[in-house]
């Protein structure tokens, strides 16, 4: 499938030779970043912060979406309960990052697609409950295209297939500008989830798409996610002639 990358290096800063007019921003334009290599968590966090800062200071500056993979790590949302870490803090098997998103501890690793969306909800809908449900629907729509039934569970956030959670959602929002987003387990090693209570849900079962579609790879799913995000949030991808 087409893995063409429409991007500009985030390290250079979102204002580097970018001229996004109010008319473009109002049509919900966004830059799409699909790094070819696995990205350290702290690097991607820095990219998001750059765009977040610029969107807060100038609402018509570029929005951005990333679809990428991380090296193995754990992340904890604001207010996460450390009792959900099944190891001593000073003896962690993997890096642990405390970040400004909702939700409890989760696990990132290669073979899992992480989607980060830095969007100005003033250009979409200023409703966080709506936004969470839309992110879930992005994943459910992709699963439907793959012939897998994805579903929500009443009172919880995320996406399940049968009795296994395959997609997680965790967002931050400041002045109606979002950060963080979703993760979807594709063909990853799930052993790291044994070291935590995922999302604070005791006895939750975690699954991956390869449980239902043996041999499926990240490169098979990324284009579907790209189109699902674009369609759900009515985005137009801005093309930049520079690669990560």
UniProtKB/Swiss-Prot annotation:
Binding of substrate, residues: 101-108, 168-170, 181-183
Main location: cytoplasm
Keywords attached to this entry: Acyltransferase, Cytoplasm, Transferase
Pathway assigned to this chain's UniProt record: Protein modification; protein lipoylation via endogenous pathway; protein N(6)-(lipoyl)lysine from octanoyl-[acyl-carrier-protein]: step 1/2
Keyword Glycosyltransferase in annotation: no
One Gene Ontology MF term: lipoyl(octanoyl) transferase activity
EC number: 2.3.1.181
Keyword match Magnesium: no
Note: In the reaction, the free carboxyl group of octanoic acid is attached via an amide linkage to the epsilon-amino group of a specific lysine residue of lipoyl domains of lipoate-dependent enzymes.
Function: Catalyzes the transfer of endogenously produced octanoic acid from octanoyl-acyl-carrier-protein onto the lipoyl domains of lipoate-dependent enzymes. Lipoyl-ACP can also act as a substrate although octanoyl-ACP is likely to be the physiological substrate.
Protein name: Octanoyltransferase
Species of the source: Prochlorococcus marinus (strain NATL1A)
